[in-house]
Amino acid sequence: IIFKAPLEEPANPTWAPNPAKAPWYFLGLQEMLVYFDPWMAGVVLPVFIIIGLVAIPYIDTNPKGNGYYTFSERKMAISCFMFGWLVLWIFLIIIGTFLRGPNWTFYGPFEYWDFHKVVAEANINLSEIIWIKMLGTTMPSNLIVREIFGIFVILAYFGISGAMITKKWGQDILEKTGKIRYYFFLFLVLFMATLPIKMYLRWLFTLKYIVALPEWELNL
């Protein structure tokens, strides 16, 4: 209601606005492009976020709360929905609307938008950190060997994290929902969590990709 999102004229190839921002309701997707490849940020993540939010009522079969609002009786369903809605969507829209300025540079809430601001960002892949910085050697020519550490991190995240969550918190949910619905729910939760995790890794360690396979157009 407050922020304008008009349907403007067709794009002019001879002129580009700076910052080139989508309407506010698409800025969440545009912000995802900072951290992921277009196929992941524009297709895979949004699809799984939507699937996860739609699947919540089918996974959580708790009959309590039908016809009335109660957080205490539907903690799992409401918490998952609010995480997907507020963290994975509204938070990204706020960043894109208020904190991204010219050249899609990050600005503070009251910082002046300087069109000539230059930010020295040296984003680096996990394979480069391990092979070049830590081991002091050149990058292997074999693609799988080069990215083996990143592949292990991805598999360990879904495998080990999933097992730890199941052991510590998931037994009760597993008994109530059954194996198929529980493991589908666990996969969706872990997959949705990859977005804030990747954002923090970029902010804290300037990490670009955990697995970088541009030869296969597969970067994670």
Language-model region placement:
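Hydrophobic cores of alpha-helical transmembrane segments in multi-pass integral membrane proteins
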Residues: 1-66, 70-220
